[in-house]
Amino acid sequence: MEFKIVNTICPYCGVGCGLGLVVKDGRVIGIHPNKRHPINEGKLCAKGNYCYQFIHSKDRLTKPLIKKESGFVETTWNKALEVIAENLKTYKDEIGFFSSARCTNEDNYILQKFARVALKTNNIDHCARLUHSATVTGMSACFGSGAMTNSIEDIELADCILIIGSNTFEQHPLIARRIMRAKDKGAKIIVIDPRRTITAKNSDIYLQIIPGTNVALINAMINVIIKENLIDKEFIKNRTEGFEKLKEIIKKYTPEYASKICGVDKELIIESAKIYGNAERASIIYCMGVTQFTHGVDAVKALCNLAMITGNIGKEGTGVNPLRGQNNVQGACDMGALPNVFPGYQKVEDGYKLFEEYWKTDLNPNSGLTIPEMIDESGKNIKFLYIMGENPIVSDPDVKHVEKALKSLDFLVVQDIFLTETAKLADVVLPAACWAEKDGTFTNTERRVQLIRKAVNPPGEALEDWIIIKKLAEKLGYGDKFNYNKVEDIFNEIRKVTPQYRGITYKRLKIDGIHWPCLDENHSGTKILHKDKFLTDNGRGKIFPVEYREVAELPDKDYPFILTTGRIIFHYHTGTMTRRCKNLVEEINEPFIEINPDDAKSLKIENGDLVKVISRRGEITAKARITEDIKKGVVFMPFHFVEANPNVLTNTALDELCKIPELKVCAVKIERI
């Protein structure tokens, strides 16, 4: 009887908790705490504790599938790859790729390289487009980098923690532990959220904002801080530019003015601003409740402005800290799984010559299409789509639009571990290994690169993602460009072409991981960014004054409620993995909609009633959950349940700067069934 513990990293959110997979007779049978891990110190959330339960699911894909008139039939790898290769040759100029935040750095690197080297296209994107593209665009403009500025451990050192648009206690529970430690030491916690979440219930001040009014509220806090002279004059003078213009624009954003927009008492705005402004070390934490709007970039810039004018950047216990929602969404961005940048955020238009030298081939010098653009162009300028580890028919806005787009393709390939809702539409389905069945690296929300380790073999004929892409490259005659014998070979190439990873090696990652940038093998990594200068062209932080703008779809007499969406503690994204975990399903396995008691009374809806939720794009059915935790006029639904997927209802309106959809707000009506 073989029995072993394999230390690896959790496959869910972006915290990057360490855990041990308990293996017996070639199967993972449980989780062993990794008490030495610097992030979670042996603790795990519910999802982490039961993450092993989907590994050996009977639903796992085990053989390649080709769709015939009668449905899917099993085939050989050789046949499947030949069919894909022939279609790639046919549609060479009309191809798009979706990469994946669930896959390793190595998997993402090799797919974006395959797209660019073998197909000469920059039409590659992944789900960061739907979550933190606003962060990358906004923070890069202000700071020169779109990543979390401080480490997770560092949060404990803050005197004030401003949490906006993040239910940290449910979605990043091990970061919430750090927040509570800071609170125990005297830190003040400010929470801004339309829902009175468990995070809000643990705050010192709670501002129950109307969804989509973040910019007005943040600007009002800045107004108070300037008026009360709580700014850091030396930091502004020596480290930033643009403050005078901000002062002018911010004058109209008085607490009284913002209160009418945000639905928050002006005294709470004033008190929050004073607490943040008076703190010696103030940290900002945010998530999708800031980014998933048509003005998401503006909200990110506003938060950066708030941090810069108070000098809360570049030192312990401070910073602007966007929490990543997926295990490797940071890494997928780092690897260049984006249409406008190569690995290391080197812009396509500026960096293509350099990568032509690296990869010894001609490259396309023009930026490619984003996910929303590829969806819109499906059946027109995009005829072939290759999707690795993404489920857009559940996760993307306006599901009917996505389904119609995917069905209009001439050829669709899906590479995944389960036959997802998206995979069911594919012409060819390729069975992939899950995270427990491969070696590689993930990069977590704080830029910490960590090793994941293979614990068991993939089921049946399933293969690691990078091996599948390598085999496909060989079919197209590009085997010499993908001559890797093991996954570490790919990482060594990543180091050469990605400046932030240059000093990181597998050997150095064996203990605690390393925060990028790590410039050489003697460098210990960088826990705090922007200590002495920003990563902008002149080293100064750029203050960008931003104005409040309304959301794309406001409630009206026909659709009087604002629907906002999100996650719950027991499930993850489209539910593909967590809804195959017995213990998590036992906690909750049915969709619901949260409704304020006053709204429920006016609609004659009682707790547990089935209701229809209807938008201009579709309708779904769910059980009513009556709660004072949701603001009047606002309703909330999680998007884990495909049988009542709120993305049937959501709007495809985009932030024009980063192309993120406005997933956090759409107008709906509710009818009792």
UniProtKB/Swiss-Prot annotation:
GO BP term (any one): formate metabolic process
Matching entries from PANTHER family are given as: FORMATE DEHYDROGENASE H, RESPIRATORY NITRATE REDUCTASE
**Any Pfam family hit:** Molydop_binding
Q: Which NCBIfam families match?
A: Fdh-alpha
Species annotation: Methanocaldococcus jannaschii (strain ATCC 43067 / DSM 2661 / JAL-1 / JCM 10045 / NBRC 100440)
> What are its E.C. numbers?
1.17.98.3
Tell me the SMART domains matching this sequence.
Molybdop_Fe4S4
Kindly provide the name given to this protein in its UniProt entry: F420-dependent formate dehydrogenase subunit alpha
